[in-house]
């Protein structure tokens, strides 16, 4: 049985979607939750209330994941509040999809900063604490697009592929300190982003998936739970795809 009782997790970009599902599932297993998003809103307030109703401590910190200094401030606030940090989930992400010839420098920079630089920011800030503890699990959210690419998503694909190389390198640096680092590569998952697509576009997406359906956010969260728990105590430097056999 998975038990995260007394552990502390920080999840970036967690007010909605996959991050929210991870926060709720971790809380169901006794984990105290700190989470970030770009600003406080109804989603973040509702998640805080829901987490507290599950009997765990919950802390929301509004923060821009792409800001290096802010990431260090967030980690310090988490440690000051909970006394430790056991699990880091780098989940913050955005898209600015367009064909390469139409892509602006700003669209490229925005996606790389939020999706990839944020992983560096938070890992850089969190690893000293985890090294002092001589334990920790780092989980970063990549994507099927980071593995196989996708037309119109060169910036997004580059950011998600970069996460894979970063996590594999980090696992080799930190393994001797009993800190594990892994990535999850979701396929098409039902989130507000995919639900907003026209029905015909979503139908075409589903045709590409051998299991003939989109994934649920909870299905990604279950993999994160495995990677956060002792069930994966000898798993590090891996990329686990959650894509319905799409890749």
Model-derived regions, located:
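Conserved glycine-rich cofactor-binding loop
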Residues: 8, 15-17
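Conserved glycine-rich Rossmann-like NAD(P)H-binding loop of the short-chain dehydrogenase/reductase
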Residues: 29-46
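Substrate-binding pocket helix/loop in short-chain dehydrogenase/reductase
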Residues: 99-100, 107-112, 194, 205
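Active-site helix of classical SDR
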Residues: 123, 159, 167
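Alpha-helical segment proximal to the catalytic Tyr-Lys
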Residues: 128, 172-176, 233
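Residue(s) in the substrate-gating loop at a strand-loop-helix junction
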Residues: 143
């Amino acid at each position: 049985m998975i038990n995260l009782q007394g552990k502390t997790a920080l999840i970036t970009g967690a007010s909605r979607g996959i991050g929210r599902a991870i926060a709720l599932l971790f809380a169901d297993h006794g984990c105290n939750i700190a989470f970030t998003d770009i600003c406080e809103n109804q989603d973040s307030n509702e998640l805080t209330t829901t987490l507290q109703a599950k009997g765990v401590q919950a802390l929301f910190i509004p923060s821009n994941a792409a800001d290096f200094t802010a990431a260090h401030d967030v980690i310090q606030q988490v440690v000051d509040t909970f006394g430790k940090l056991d699990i880091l989930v780098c989940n913050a992400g955005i898209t600015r999809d367009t064909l390469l010839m139409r892509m602006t420098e700003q669209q490229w920079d925005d996606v790389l900063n939020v999706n990839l630089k944020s992983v560096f920011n938070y890992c850089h800030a969190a690893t000293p604490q985890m090294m002092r503890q001589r334990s920790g699990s780092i989980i970063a959210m990549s994507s099927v697009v980071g593995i196989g690419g996708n037309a119109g998503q060169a910036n997004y694909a580059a950011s998600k592929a970069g996460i894979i190389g970063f996590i594999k390198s980090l696992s080799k640096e930190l393994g001797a300190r009993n800190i594990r680092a892994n990535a999850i590569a979701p396929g098409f998952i039902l989130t507000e982003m995919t639900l907003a697509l026209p029905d015909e576009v979503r139908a075409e997406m589903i045709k590409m998936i051998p299991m003939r359906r989109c994934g649920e956010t909870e299905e990604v969260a279950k993999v994160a739970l495995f990677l956060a728990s002792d069930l994966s105590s000898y798993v590090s430097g891996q990329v686990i795809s959650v894509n319905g056999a799409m890749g």
